[in-house]
Amino acid sequence: SHLAPFVDVSRQKLRKSVIEERIESGEVLDDAIIDKITERRLRTEVQSGIQTIQYQLITLMTCNGQAPFVTVFMYLDEVPEGRTRDDLAMIIEEVMKQRMQGVKNEKGVWITPAFPKLIYVLDEDNITEDSKYWYLTELAAKCTAKRMVPDYISAKIMKELKNGDVYPCMGCRSFLTVEDSQRNADGSHKFYGRFNQGVVTINLVDVACSAEGNMERFWEILDERLELCHRALRCRHERLLGTVSDVAPILWQNGALARLKKGETIDKLLFDGYSTISLGYAGLYEMCMRMLGKSHTDPEAKPFALAVMQRLNDKCKEWKEAENISYSVYGTPMESTTYKFAKCLQKRFGIIPGVTDKNYITNSYHVHVTEKIDAFSKLKFESEFQKLSPGGAISYIEVPNMQTNIPAVLSVLQYIYENIMYAELNTKSDFCEVCGYDGEIKIIEDETGKLVWECPNC
């Protein structure tokens, strides 16, 4: 939305150029013709601009050799109705067209770039076939089927959970909390410019295994581990205290996160809700299996899982009230940590069927990958837990190649809009870097039980 006002700047510049050209060539100054030529040139300029942004982001490297984790937020209602919103729609359309095309790798094959991450907001003006911007949602569905992006935020559900606000996450799923103390000049809640101080994740499976199925002991150990996490989060917070704005002028002095003076510390930004700090959690499924012998999808285990989530939130609220630091519960992405946690559990407790017998533990509140459940039921079930992860979480559904069944993708998007705040469709978008095969590559277990890719071609 921040780019949208500049589209009309280009439009006026191009229109002036078209008029000058027609005067020089002695052609008639017909407004309809001038507007048609202007809009055609404008579309080309927007296309070129979006392509430039994409290529600059994926070729820019951070100090540790990674592409920056940038999230592009596509929300039509962030700008006023009329020309500016239509210009934003043009930008969104081009962003998705560029992503559908992909980028060429060294073999000259169009592949899916990992970044920037795209988030598309589903709202009243784009969720039904008769809505004005339905064509963008159709394009988003096609893009998802081919490139696994964008991810989707339901404006309807987010407004219910976030005091009427709709705003992007940082990276893949870290959401700021709504803070009445943080407002823009117009009185609206402030999100852009705020940040997160870091995350510490509690291994809920370890808590359950340590309790050995004893419920009273479980709650005692959980509180002990939560206090350990609290101490670790305080270490992160205190490490930032005293940092002067000079260490990163773009962030702290030039407006990316704040406009502090030279030599001023960032301390005031660490309190009063300007930034958040996250209590992550992992392994809700395995926790229930160890304590109750049932998945958290079982009606008998679900209340226990929700009670644990509520305890995490209660602790964050308690710490926040005592320290004026904005603690929040966060569904940790895990990534490599899932393997690390699993290995540590096996070392401490051995192989427990259904609990520690895999080389991973389940991400946050997610339904276990081996459970038989349809996409709609999974989203509906997980939506109850997403409410209890105010610091961020995302739900996924796994689908086959959907490029020939876009209506089915659209039906999933409409279900997301009505039922869950933030979700993503994982489809197949594989490319073998050895032989160049472009198609579905299977995941198998090697001789050690580790999940590996197996190309059907080579």
Language model features by range: what are they?
Residues 1-273, 294, 298-458:
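Conserved catalytic cores of very large enzyme subunits
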